[in-house]
């Protein structure tokens, strides 16, 4: 793929664009291009560029990783385009619209300009100057782009500039990255790190479900919301028909991604990557085009599980496999590259990135420029352990796909592109995703078997039953790189793996606000994010006047300010009547205040199992351009309760409302023996151990991030009936910790 950037209404745009292109050097080594309003230059490197006179307020830049023909960018016709794209149906689009194009990017700009002319003819502008936009309403242009992109099959991130307008968009799943800033003009780039050195402070990731328009003359922004996939209507055909359709779509997703040159496959020997490799072997490659599988792991006496299994599968299926094994010292050197690349010290994220990076290094040494990945199968087909605890599997799959751009695709893109390798992800094919989200949950999770339909497909293909039944192991564990990070952290005297990784990336991952209820879940979720090097800028508390609110915790919520003081974190409070129609708007106002006052980039929630809460929070945050983190999502409830106690949280039950509980539970500290009792009640009557069914609410008195603890000096216990009681804390103060 490629790297794109642009700077508009900024005095030193040319200098900033060149700096951004240099930061993204490995995204494209075939050509570099840059243009302004009246000039365009291409060269093999920045030193060879020769600039003509022209305005430097507005500049587009591009780094080319050429895969289909050799078309330099920016491309200039009536307007100008920079694109990081791989469009698999560009030839079909050319036939449909009668357009001759040299490659997919060339097709994209020609198609945009064809559609633009249609808008002009509909308005009969009659202007002879083709270089201006003729005052077509912004909403019409954005809608046209949305309709055009709906016809495109593939992945992309692009910018189109015509006259006083520029538009940016990315594929609907966010496989190709795009970041932007609107502080003092407008800037964008394929990677966040390309904008950081330019002094931008409000860098945001473009939501793939938005098309973004910028008016140069008025310095204004317009966005257009794109429709996403749906889990309805669910497929009702017999299961054998669904299996046939699924296999056909998967085979097509693989075959359309075949490049015209030798390629690689990220291979763990697990279900997802082995199915991809087997299909690549059997679908009929082009003459002379072959592939190699690559896997990586820690070099130690015992083979890492993924390396051992990859070797067995490769031998059994006749696959060409190369293994990259690295020792502890080399792991540390790789971490110096990987952690700044992914711009994160999140331990699982770094572990996965390290595994991929090592495999990509081996592929790069072989001259590989395209690799296939099995990414997306777990999100699409319920492949994680947490899916086994889900009551609404397809809604969870939908949420995973909706947010996959925040969690996985940017990491994978920057790691592969740093090795000058384009990553292709068949499981995230648009048609396949649309189909799979509507597959009945029972065909994804059957008994205790996840990804059931993919396992069935593997057996239908003739793959070994052993493979089809193999349980998933995350890449960082299967490669043993997580173990290596642990050893390095211990050797360095770091308290945690995150502390050790901070030396490679000294910034906080993101600035976050916490939807703070005063209870155990929001407190624990915040602690987890702090431990992962996220900066907690503020707490956000919604004080509901409705005691029966499904959205917001109400017991003793007025004491959230005391908890905030104990932690030394600012608190934003918003009162709501708790009416279903208005409480989300009140929450949105509070989060918007946090964004404006503290510059937060995301929200932390303590959601465990409530889709009702999580989906509404995600909808609000989507509208505000914020990411959502729910680190407790689908955690085992007994595990959560025991972890809270083991790491030093001190909390009481502030209310109870369930058979098996009574007033003796409220107002006193919860201990291990109480968790034992809750577990027995769960076994006997199905009571939720962590109170997820509304059995109880909690109030935190102390925790690892509290500088002082809360001492309750007076409280009132109110018994409503035999199984329902609550406590009102009437006097509480902060005291020094022992």
Annotated model-derived regions:
Residues 414, 421-426, 430-437, 441, ...:
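ATP/NTP-dependent adenylation/nucleotidyl-transfer catalytic domains that generate, transfer
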Residues 299-360, 366, 386-393, 417, ...:
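ATP-dependent adenylate-handling ligase core
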């Amino acid at each position: 793929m490629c790297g794109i950037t642009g700077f508009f209404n900024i005095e030193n745009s040319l200098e900033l664009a060149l700096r951004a292109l240099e930061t993204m050097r490995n995204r494209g080594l075939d050509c570099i291009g840059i243009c302004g309003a009246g000039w365009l230059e291409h060269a093999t490197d920045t030193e060879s560029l020769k600039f003509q006179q022209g305005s430097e307020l507005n500049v587009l830049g591009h780094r080319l990783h050429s895969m289909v023909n050799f078309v330099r960018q920016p491309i200039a016709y009536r307007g100008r385009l920079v694109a990081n794209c791989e469009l698999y149906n560009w030839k079909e689009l050319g036939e449909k619209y009668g357009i001759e194009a040299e490659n997919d990017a060339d097709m994209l700009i020609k198609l945009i300009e064809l559609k633009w002319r249609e808008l002009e003819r509909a308005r009969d502008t009659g202007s002879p100057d083709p270089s201006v936009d003729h005052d077509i309403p912004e909403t019409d242009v954005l809608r046209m782009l949305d309709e055009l992109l709906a016809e495109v099959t593939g992945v992309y991130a692009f910018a189109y500039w015509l006259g006083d307008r520029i538009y940016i968009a990315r594929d609907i799943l966010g496989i190709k990255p795009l970041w932007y800033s609107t502080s003092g003009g407008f800037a964008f780039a394929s990677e966040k790190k390309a904008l950081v050195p330019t002094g931008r402070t409000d860098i945001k990731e473009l939501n793939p479900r938005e098309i973004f328009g910028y008016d140069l003359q008025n310095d204004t922004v317009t966005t257009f919301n794109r429709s996403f996939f749906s889990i309805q209507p669910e497929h009702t055909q017999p299961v054998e028909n669904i299996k046939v359709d699924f296999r056909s779509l998967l085979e097509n997703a693989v075959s359309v991604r075949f490049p015209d040159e030798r390629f690689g496959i990220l291979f763990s020997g697990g279900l997802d990557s082995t199915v991809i490799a087997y299909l690549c072997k059997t679908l009929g490659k082009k003459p002379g085009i072959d592939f190699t599988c690559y896997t990586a792991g820690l070099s130690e006496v015992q083979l890492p599980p993924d390396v051992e299994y990859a070797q067995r599968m490769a031998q059994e299926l006749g696959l060409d496999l190369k293994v990259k094994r690295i020792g502890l010292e080399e792991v540390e050197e790789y971490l110096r590259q990987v952690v700044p690349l992914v711009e994160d010290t999140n331990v699982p994220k770094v572990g996965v990135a390290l595994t991929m990076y090592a495999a990509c290094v081996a592929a790069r040494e072989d001259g590989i420029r395209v690799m296939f990945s099995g990414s997306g199968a777990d999100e699409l087909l319920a492949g994680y352990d947490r899916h086994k605890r889900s009551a609404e599997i397809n809604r969870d799959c939908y949420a995973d796909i909706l947010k996959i751009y925040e969690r996985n695709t940017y990491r994978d893109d920057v790691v592969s592109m740093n090795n000058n390798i384009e990553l292709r992800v068949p499981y995230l094919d648009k048609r396949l995703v649309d189909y799979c989200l509507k597959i009945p949950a029972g065909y994804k999770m059957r008994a205790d078997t996840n990804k059931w339909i993919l396992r069935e497909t593997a057996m239908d293909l003739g793959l070994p039953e052993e493979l089809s039944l193999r349980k998933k192991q995350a890449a960082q564990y299967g490669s043993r790189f997580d173990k290596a990070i642990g050893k390095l952290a211990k050797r360095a005297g770091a308290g945690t793996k995150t502390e050790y990784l901070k030396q490679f990336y000294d910034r906080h991952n993101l600035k976050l606000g916490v939807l703070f209820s005063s209870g155990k879940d929001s407190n624990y979720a915040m602690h987890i994010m702090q431990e992962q090097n996220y900066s907690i800028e503020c707490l956000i508390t919604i004080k509901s006047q409705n005691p029966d609110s499904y959205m917001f915790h109400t017991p003793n919520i007025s004491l959230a300010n005391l908890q905030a003081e104990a932690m030394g974190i600012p608190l934003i409070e918003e009162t709501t009547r708790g009416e279903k129609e208005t409480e989300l708007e009140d929450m949105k106002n509070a989060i918007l205040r946090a964004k404006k006052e503290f510059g937060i980039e995301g929200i932390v929630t303590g959601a465990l199992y409530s889709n009702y809460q999580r989906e509404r929070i995600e909808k609000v945050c989507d509208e505000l351009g914020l990411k959502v983190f729910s680190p407790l999502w689908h955690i085992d409830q007994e595990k959560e309760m025991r972890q809270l106690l083991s790491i030093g949280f001190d909390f009481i039950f502030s209310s109870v409302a369930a058979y098996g509980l009574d007033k003796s539970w409220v107002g006193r500290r919860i201990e291990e023996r109480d968790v034992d009792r809750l577990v027995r009640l769960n076994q006997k009557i199905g009571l939720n151990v962590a109170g997820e069914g509304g059995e109880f609410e909690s109030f935190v008195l102390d925790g690892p991030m509290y500088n002082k603890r809360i001492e309750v000096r007076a409280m009132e216990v109110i018994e409503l009936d035999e199984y329902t009681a609550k406590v009102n804390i009437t006097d509480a103060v902060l005291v020094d910790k022992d």
